[in-house]
């Protein structure tokens, strides 16, 4: 069994459902410390939702001119996994790593314990071959990416920023591939902006609408306009901004009562062609134009970020091409990731991991043939970046 596969299985065996790290970070710190990494726990959050965070950095020896040339690459990931769902529906126990049909089954197999294992082993191999690199290497790992994401990477980045920590390149190990490891990387993500709209009316008997004011009826024209609005056209890197309703709650449960209010949850996934402030202003303008009596609260989940083709993208593309022969596709589609926090202090952030077809599903799995190539791609990327750090 390869070291990468073995470490992946060891991580899967830890039932690390958000926010419980279940010992994953201790296991990883024990692997990293002998390599010269300074491992620092930056745990955060209340006692009833305590989040485990690990910042682990290996600083290259430097003197004179080398000090100015050295750069830092960070691998970012999460040890937490989503709940298993009904265990009886799994073909094998979700936290017992199981081989079947050329795949490794277990919760977290593809999202994202295989990526973490691949990077750790890639670092081990890189340092064995290059014991005195010009490159600083760091890992940022959290047990709260699948949950609220409040006390995880976000908190660590705030602390690193306060210290003046310099990050040059970041690889997030999210499962970005589609059919084969390396066929797609994410070089950016859309922003996410959520709103909760409460439209107020007057409750009354459904047989006497003249004595009431139905907030559902009042809200529908405004919601129809919002759903039909073209917010922007997108650009070469991002699809157009989208607006979607996720929940509508109104009524008392009785069929003969006009409700006094209706609550609508909605979300923007927005490109760099729009801003959170601009979208908020446009929504308020529509609601005001329709004369609604309403309250609206906003939650900004993350700003969009984009890494244009440059040092990091090219290094990863070269590594993928050398390992697999693939010409990888750059994409910004999909949901958010912790890359949105890291991009605040790191100018180049990409995401690369195994295929994502089974993530969050019953019988989550990763193909065995996708694990070792991922490690090799990470290893080749480290070689490329180390050459750039000393250039």
Swiss-Prot record:
Active-site positions on this chain: 80, 145 (proton acceptor)
Task: Indicate the enzyme's highest-level EC class.
Answer: hydrolase
Q: Which GO terms describe its molecular function?
A: acetylornithine deacetylase activity; cobalt ion binding; succinyl-diaminopimelate desuccinylase activity; zinc ion binding
The pathway where this protein functions is: Amino-acid biosynthesis; L-lysine biosynthesis via DAP pathway; LL-2,6-diaminopimelate from (S)-tetrahydrodipicolinate (succinylase route): step 3/3
Record EC number? 3.5.1.18
Cofactor comment: Binds 2 Zn(2+) or Co(2+) ions per subunit.
Against InterPro entries, the record matches this protein to:
ArgE/DapE_CS (IPR001261), Bact_exopeptidase_dim_dom (IPR036264), DapE_proteobac (IPR005941), Peptidase_M20 (IPR002933), Peptidase_M20_dimer (IPR011650), Peptidase_M20A (IPR050072)
Q: Which GO terms describe its biological process?
A: diaminopimelate biosynthetic process; L-arginine biosynthetic process; lysine biosynthetic process via diaminopimelate
Catalytic activity annotated for this protein? Answer: N-succinyl-(2S,6S)-2,6-diaminopimelate + H2O = (2S,6S)-2,6-diaminopimelate + succinate
Its protein name is: Succinyl-diaminopimelate desuccinylase
Please list the residues that bind Zn(2+) 1.
78, 111, 174
Tell me what gene encodes this. Answer: dapE
UniProt-annotated binding residues for Zn(2+) 2: 111, 146, 360
Keyword annotations for this protein, in alphabetical order, are: Amino-acid biosynthesis, Cobalt, Diaminopimelate biosynthesis, Hydrolase, Lysine biosynthesis, Metal-binding, Zinc
Instruction: State the Gene3D superfamilies in the record.
Output: Zn peptidases
Q: State the family it belongs to.
A: Belongs to the peptidase M20A family. DapE subfamily.
Per its UniProt record, the required cofactor names are: Zn(2+); Co(2+)
SUPFAM superfamilies xrefs: Bacterial exopeptidase dimerisation domain, Zn-dependent exopeptidases
Q: Which NCBIfam families match?
A: dapE_proteo, PRK13009.1
Please give the function described in this protein's UniProt entry: Catalyzes the hydrolysis of N-succinyl-L,L-diaminopimelic acid (SDAP), forming succinate and LL-2,6-diaminopimelate (DAP), an intermediate involved in the bacterial biosynthesis of lysine and meso-diaminopimelic acid, an essential component of bacterial cell walls.
């Amino acid at each position: 069994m390869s070291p990468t596969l073995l470490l992946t299985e060891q991580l899967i065996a830890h039932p690390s459902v958000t926010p419980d790290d279940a010992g994953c970070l201790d296991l990883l710190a024990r692997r990293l410390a002998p390599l010269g990494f300074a491992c620092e726990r930056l745990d955060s959050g209340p006692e009833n939702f305590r989040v485990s965070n690990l910042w682990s950095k290996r600083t290259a020896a430097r003197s004179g001119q080398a000090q100015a040339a050295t750069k830092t690459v960070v691998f970012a990931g999460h040890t937490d996994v989503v709940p298993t769902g009904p265990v009886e529906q799994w073909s094998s126990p979700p936290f017992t790593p199981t081989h079947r049909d050329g795949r490794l089954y277990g919760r977290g197999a593809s999202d994202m314990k295989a990526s973490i294992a691949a990077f750790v082993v890639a670092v081990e191999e890189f340092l064995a071959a290059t014991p005195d690199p010009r490159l600083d290497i760091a890992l940022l790992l959290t047990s709260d990416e699948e949950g609220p994401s409040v006390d995880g990477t976000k908190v660590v980045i705030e602390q690193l920023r306060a210290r003046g920590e310099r990050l040059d390149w970041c690889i997030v190990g999210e499962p970005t591939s589609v059919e084969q490891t390396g066929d797609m990387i994410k070089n950016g993500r859309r922003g996410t902006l959520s709103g909760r709209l409460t439209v107020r009316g007057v409750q009354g008997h459904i047989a006497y609408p003249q004595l009431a004011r139905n907030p559902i009826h009042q809200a529908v024209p405004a919601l129809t306009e919002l759903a039909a609005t073209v917010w922007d056209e997108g650009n070469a890197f991002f699809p157009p901004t989208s607006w979607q309703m996720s929940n509508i709650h109104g009524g008392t449960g009785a069929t003969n009562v006009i409700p006094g209010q209706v609550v609508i949850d909605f979300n923007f996934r927005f490109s760099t062609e729009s801003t959170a402030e601009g979208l908020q202003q446009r929504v308020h303008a529509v609601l005001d134009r329709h004369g609604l009596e309403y309250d609206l609260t906003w939650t900004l989940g993350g700003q969009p970020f984009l890494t244009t083709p440059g040092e990091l993208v090219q290094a990863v593309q070269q590594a993928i091409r050398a390992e697999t022969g693939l010409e990888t596709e750059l994409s910004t589609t999909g949901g958010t990731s912790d890359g949105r926090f890291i991009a605040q202090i790191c100018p180049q952030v990409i995401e690369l991991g195994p295929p994502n077809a089974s993530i969050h599903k019953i019988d989550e799995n990763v193909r065995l043939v996708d694990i070792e190539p991922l490690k090799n791609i990470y290893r080749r990327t480290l070689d490329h970046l180390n050459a750039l750090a000393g250039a």
